[in-house]
Each structure stands twice: as structure tokens, then as C-alpha cells.
């Protein structure tokens, strides 16, 4: 039987696999904000990125290792393909963290070996022990993944795993890379690995899965029953294609059904000991932060964190909940940090009051960021009678979202009505030469006119593919959150902003998206799964930290 830590280890890959969602690219400050919140959430491992991909990715992982890595905090992990170049860059990036891990991988399915890697099984059997041993010479904590394990030949898979453990791997990850398996199949795969790998007792079994068939969470829970003790997941289930297994769904399934899962940990069914180290009251805040910063909206009926997760429309359901919450609710909303608390802050409130409330909410801002957030708070307080925690969340998340800005919005002015053509006047500052230009455009509506004017000024070709707006809180004076996604050369960039004027919010969101596009094109990066491994060592970043 595989090594058992006595509970489930939560391995969060929001900053690596989650960021590979189209349009979910994050800047350094955003990654840091999410990493700090993941630490507050209580995840065991943060996979902070793929350091070899680009100098920017290296810097982000290194910064997280420096500022989030603590003796009593999460393990900081980086991803590396099975090549010395990747592994060396990964080690250098995570080295500042007291608790660090190198996560290296290679494909084991025949379809990947033939069509992607152009390698034989014999090649893989030679590469795995060599690269795991090299990684082990740098750090003690090594995770090895058999990419596309669920479609690999079982006997070959067992052989690869045995070699990886013998070379020093302490965690063996079994990915369902394309979300292909069903729960019974995935559970059997984990069970068979336990039975057929002689040295599996020297490593923790981890699972990683995608949601292409909507089965990722179910597969993971079946894996837990069969000995998996680390779950690789993302906040809100974001990730490539249909996404990854959702952290909040997995954690709350194990929390609510603890009496069922306890027996798989040799506990009494009524044991009160938690199955994970997650602070569940931080779940909602973490979900909103990731949604705001990535621009990926959570569907209203999403389990645990969706807007309707604790809403009841049916009269029968409403009556039952009023009489006894347990009639139709299996989770207390407060357990996941959901509350309607309103704070008595207004236009007369001072910096210390705002700072104190932000600290209570878990935000630790620098002096400069606090000054900026307070200025936005005062501006909002002049226009909005009642400030809520959601308003403060919107202010702070937008504060850290701002990318490196080539463009800054100076003026937004629109005119529209049922008897006039929507017209927008926009002034935009180019920070590279500090010049300011103004353009006027007509559109099908005020937002369309704003976007047309911005495109005239920015001269950055793109296609608007999504515009969405939602209210942060209730009331006529509520903040409106706008998310805009644009596409160029098959890459998607998102922008997010909040304002009581949704047209102004739309203009700011569009400028944020344009800045992301411009910033992204200044850097090049590689994909850990799709880029050729052949030249990885030759193309090692000569000085990745700069």
C-alpha cells in the first residue's frame, strides 16, 4: 500500500494548470495575491508555475517561493519536464522556499510517445530514473507524473513508477490528462498500482484529472477510496479545455461526507478529525479572488461557490429552510465563508478603519496599495450609500489586477438615447512617451462606441469575444463588475473592472485587456505539454532570474 499521511493533501495548481485556461493569464502581482490567499486557505502544496517557460514565469515562481514559502506554510512546487534544463530552472526558482518540491513528468501512453515525444518505451525507461535522480540531487521532495497515465499500458506504467520511486520520487502522480476515465476505472487504476508496484509504500499516490466528461471530482473521490492521498485541483475548477477537478467541491465533499470517507483512513465513522487541512471559511473569498483576477466568471449554479448554491426559489423549499435549514441544505453557507455582513464604513471613515477591515478580511496590503485602495474606497463612498465586504473585495482585487500599463484611461464620455446614435469620446495616455490622444466613435451602443474609440487610439488589432456585466451587491447604486475578453492570434486576454458606472467599468476593463495583450507579446513562453522536449536542455534560460 502507498504511503499514507493520515489525511488528504491538497495540491493546488491554479497558478500553473489553472492559468493555462484561455484568457486566464495572470501578472506577477496577481499571482502573488492568489498565492498568499491559497496559503491562508491552507493548501498543502502550491504549484506556482512552470519556471522554464519564460523569464516571467521563473520570476513569479521565485517571488512566491520568497514571500509565501514559510516553515509553517505550504510547499512551493514548480513543474519541470523530464530534462536537465527544466529541472535546473525549477530548482533555482523554488530554492528560496524552506519547503520546496520539483514536479517532473513525462508521458507514458503510446499515443503520446509516438505522436508527441517521438520516443520509445525503452527511451522513457532510461530517461525517468536519470532525471528523477538528477532532481533528487537538488531537493529531497520529488514528485513524478506519468502523463496520460489513464491511457497507458498498465504493465509499462507499473515499471515506470517503480523506477521513479527507486530513483528518489516521494510522490507519484497519476493524471487522467484528457478526462477519459470513469470513476470505477480510475479507482481500479489506483488500486492496481498499489497491488503491482513493489515499492509503492515509499511514495504518496497523487491524482490529477481534467473534467472533459464532467467526472473529475467523482474520479478523485473514487481514487481516495483506493489509496490516493494527494489531490491536484484548482480553485473554481479552472484549467485547460473543460477545466480541472474543483478544489472547493472536493474539499466540501470530504467535509460533508466525512463519516463515509473516514473508514478509508482507518478511522471510526464518527471521528471528528478533518480529512484535509483546508480552512473552509476561506473558500468563498478565494473563489471570488481567482474569478476576479482571471476574468473567468463562476457559473451561477456552480456547486459550493456559485451565486445560486445556497438560493431557494421553490416555495416548498423556502418554507422548509425557514423551519429547519437541514431540510434542503447540507452545507451551512457560513462554513464556506459566505455571509451578508455589511460594514459601517462610509465617506467619513478613515484609512485606519478601512485598513482594519481589510486585515479582518485577510488582506495585507503594502502602504502604496493601501493608499490606492483607500482612494478608490473614498471615491466609491461618495457615490454609494452603503459599503459591503463585496465592494471592498472588488476594490482590492482590481487593485492587484492592473497589468504593466502601456495605456491609461484619461477620459470617458458617452451620449446615447432612443433618438440618437451612441457616441463615445475617449482620451488615452500612452505611458511610453506620456502622450495623450482623443478619439470619437459611434457604435451600436455606448459600450460598443467606447471599444471602437479605444481601438482607434491603441492601434492594437483584436477581436472582442465576450462582454459580461454583473452587480456586486444589491441596490440601484451597486458596483457593476465588467469582464471583457479579447482575442488576437488565437490567444485570449481578459480585463476586469468595477464601477458604479458600467460604461466606465467597461472602458477600464477593455484597457486592462489591451495592456495584457501588449505585455504578453513582449514575452515568449513555452507550454509544458505541447512544446518539444528535444531541445529543452539546449534552450535553458541562461539567466532565468533576470
From Swiss-Prot:
Q: Cross-referenced SMART domains, in alphabetical order?
A: LeuA_dimer (SM00917)
Q: Which InterPro entries match?
A: 2-IPM_HCS-like (IPR050073), 2-isopropylmalate_synth_dimer (IPR013709), AIPM/Hcit_synth_CS (IPR002034), Aldolase_TIM (IPR013785), LeuA/HCS_post-cat (IPR054691), LeuA_allosteric_dom_sf (IPR036230), LeuA_bact_synth (IPR005671), PYR_CT (IPR000891)
- What compartments host this protein? Cytoplasm
Report the cofactors.
Mn(2+)
Query: What's the superkingdom here?
Result: Bacteria
Catalytically driven reaction(s): 3-methyl-2-oxobutanoate + acetyl-CoA + H2O = (2S)-2-isopropylmalate + CoA + H(+)
One Gene Ontology cellular component: cytoplasm
UniProt domain Pyruvate carboxyltransferase: residue ranges? 8-271
Read off the Pfam families from this record.
Answer: HCS_D2, HMGL-like, LeuA_dimer
Q: Which residues bind Mn(2+)?
A: 17, 208, 210, 244
For this protein, what is any one GO molecular function term? 2-isopropylmalate synthase activity
The protein's Enzyme Commission number:
2.3.3.13
Give the keywords, sorted. Answer: Amino-acid biosynthesis, Branched-chain amino acid biosynthesis, Cytoplasm, Leucine biosynthesis, Manganese, Metal-binding, Transferase
* Stored PANTHER family: 2-ISOPROPYLMALATE SYNTHASE 1, CHLOROPLASTIC-RELATED, HOMOCITRATE SYNTHASE-RELATED
Protein family (similarity comment): Belongs to the alpha-IPM synthase/homocitrate synthase family. LeuA type 1 subfamily.
The protein, known as: 2-isopropylmalate synthase
Provide the species name: Prochlorococcus marinus (strain MIT 9215)
Amino acid at each position: 500500500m502507498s504511503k499514507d499521511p493520515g489525511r488528504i493533501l491538497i495540491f493546488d495548481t491554479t497558478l500553473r494548470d489553472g492559468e493555462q485556461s484561455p484568457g486566464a493569464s495572470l501578472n506577477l502581482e496577481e499571482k502573488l495575491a492568489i498565492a498568499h490567499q491559497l496559503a491562508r486557505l491552507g493548501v498543502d502544496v502550491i504549484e506556482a508555475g512552470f519556471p522554464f517557460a519564460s523569464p516571467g514565469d521563473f520570476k513569479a515562481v521565485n517571488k512566491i517561493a520568497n514571500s509565501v514559502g514559510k516553515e509553517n506554510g505550504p510547499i512551493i512546487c514548480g513543474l519541470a519536464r523530464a530534462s536537465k534544463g527544466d529541472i535546473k530552472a525549477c530548482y533555482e526558482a523554488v530554492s528560496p522556499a524552506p519547503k520546496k518540491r520539483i514536479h517532473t513528468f513525462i508521458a507514458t501512453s503510446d499515443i503520446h510517445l509516438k505522436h508527441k515525444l517521438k520516443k520509445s518505451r525503452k527511451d522513457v525507461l532510461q530517461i525517468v530514473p536519470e532525471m528523477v535522480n538528477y532532481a533528487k540531487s537538488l531537493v529531497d521532495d520529488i514528485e513524478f507524473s506519468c502523463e496520460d497515465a489513464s491511457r497507458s499500458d498498465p504493465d509499462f506504467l507499473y515499471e515506470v513508477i517503480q523506477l521513479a520511486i527507486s530513483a528518489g520520487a516521494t510522490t507519484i502522480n497519476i493524471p487522467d490528462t484528457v478526462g477519459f476515465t470513469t470513476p470505477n476505472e480510475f479507482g481500479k487504476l489506483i488500486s492496481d498500482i498499489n497491488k503491482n508496484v513493489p515499492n509503492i509504500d515509499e511514495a504518496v499516490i497523487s491524482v490529477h484529472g481534467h473534467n472533459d466528461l464532467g467526472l473529475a471530482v467523482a474520479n478523485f473521490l473514487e481514487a481516495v477510496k483506493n489509496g490516493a492521498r494527494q489531490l491536484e485541483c484548482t480553485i473554481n475548477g479552472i484549467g485547460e479545455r473543460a477545466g480541472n477537478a474543483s478544489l472547493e467541491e472536493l474539499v466540501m465533499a470530504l467535509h460533508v461526507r466525512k463519516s463515509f470517507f473516514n473508514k478509508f483512513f482507518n478511522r471510526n465513522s464518527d471521528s471528528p478529525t478533518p480529512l484535509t487541512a483546508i480552512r473552509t471559511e476561506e473558500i468563498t473569498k478565494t473563489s471570488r479572488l481567482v474569478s476576479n483576477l482571471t476574468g473567468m466568471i463562476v457559473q451561477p449554479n456552480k456547486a459550493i461557490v456559485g451565486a445560486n448554491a445556497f438560493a431557494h426559489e421553490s416555495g416548498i423549499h423556502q418554507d422548509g429552510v425557514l423551519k429547519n435549514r437541514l431540510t434542503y441544505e447540507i452545507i451551512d453557507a457560513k462554513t464556506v465563508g459566505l455571509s451578508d455582513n455589511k460594514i459601517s464604513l462610509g465617506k467619513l471613515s478613515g484609512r485606519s478603519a478601512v485598513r482594519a477591515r481589510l486585515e479582518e478580511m485577510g488582506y495585507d496590503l503594502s502602504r502604496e496599495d493601501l493608499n490606492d485602495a483607500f482612494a478608490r474606497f473614498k471615491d466609491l463612498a461618495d457615490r454609494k450609500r452603503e459599503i459591503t465586504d463585496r465592494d471592498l473585495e472588488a476594490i482590492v482585487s482590481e487593485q492587484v489586477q492592473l497589468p504593466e500599463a502601456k495605456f491609461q484611461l484619461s477620459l470617458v464620455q458617452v451620449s446615447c438615447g432612443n433618438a440618437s446614435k451612441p457616441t463615445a469620446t475617449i482620451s488615452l495616455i500612452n505611458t511610453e512617451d506620456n502622450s495623450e490622444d482623443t478619439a470619437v466613435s459611434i457604435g451600436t451602443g455606448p459600450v460598443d462606441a467606447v471599444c471602437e474609440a479605444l481601438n482607434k487610439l491603441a492601434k492594437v488589432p483584436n477581436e472582442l469575444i465576450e462582454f459580461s456585466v454583473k452587480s456586486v451587491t444589491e441596490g440601484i447604486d451597486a458596483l457593476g463588475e465588467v469582464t471583457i475578453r479579447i482575442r488576437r492570434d488565437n490567444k485570449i486576454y481578459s480585463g476586469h473592472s468595477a464601477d458604479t458606472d458600467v460604461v466606465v467599468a467597461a472602458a477600464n476593463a477593455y484597457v486592462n485587456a489591451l495592456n495584457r495583450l501588449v505585455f504578453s507579446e513582449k514575452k515568449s513562453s513555452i507550454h509544458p505539454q505541447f512544446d518539444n522536449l528535444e531541445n529543452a536542455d539546449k534552450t535553458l534560460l541562461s539567466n532565468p532570474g533576470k
